[in-house]
Amino acid sequence: MLGNAMKSLFRSGARELKDKFSNDEDEDEFATPYNLRIGGAVDIDTLPMRMHVDQLRMRLPEETLIIAAQGYIELGDGGFVHRYYAANDSMIQVLTINGVKDQHVEEITLFTPFKSYYPSDRDEWAEWTAKDGRIGRTTFTLDDGTEYDRIWFDDTTSYAEPVAYSEFVYEDPESDDHDEIHHKAMLYGRNLEADKKNEYLLVSAESYDNEKTVEVMIGVDLELAMMKII
């Protein structure tokens, strides 16, 4: 299940991180599973999800996803999260363990944006990130009443501190230029029915370039067979 390896997130230097992903053939380019890459395209077979679309809260992609940026998060113990962002802010997230080749992939998840919040002052920011704030409670409820249970630290029956980590986002694989985004995040989820896929809710307070937002994304598991990578 998504999230099992993401409790030990920690930061890594941008140049050091890029070096870890460099191909032997071309040290300026990132190694990446399944040939997912900036400028590449992904068609996702959404039929398995559309069978249950009336229960899903996520917006399913209607068109080919063109990868415009790549993000990297180091988990420690040989684990990395690779994020592939489309222009519409949909995201394919891939977890790899002990390597970055196809055989090292543990999980693939599709996330689509649900809602953005823009805290205007310290008090509003604290509503999300302070102790007992919205990010970290045992449940998260959408405006329509849909409730998600906390997945990270699900063995804790009270508030849990959001997971803090840094993500390095690149728009040019041949350049060291990048954005560093600081996250305070928590993963939630719900079972649609016993025989249906889980739906995830990723809530992240993000700060970068003197900006602060709270991003809520909804996701589902993907199988490699559901993706056509071009």
Language-model-detected regions and their locations in the chain:
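Mixed-charge, low-complexity intrinsically disordered regions
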Residues: M1-E63, Q70-I230
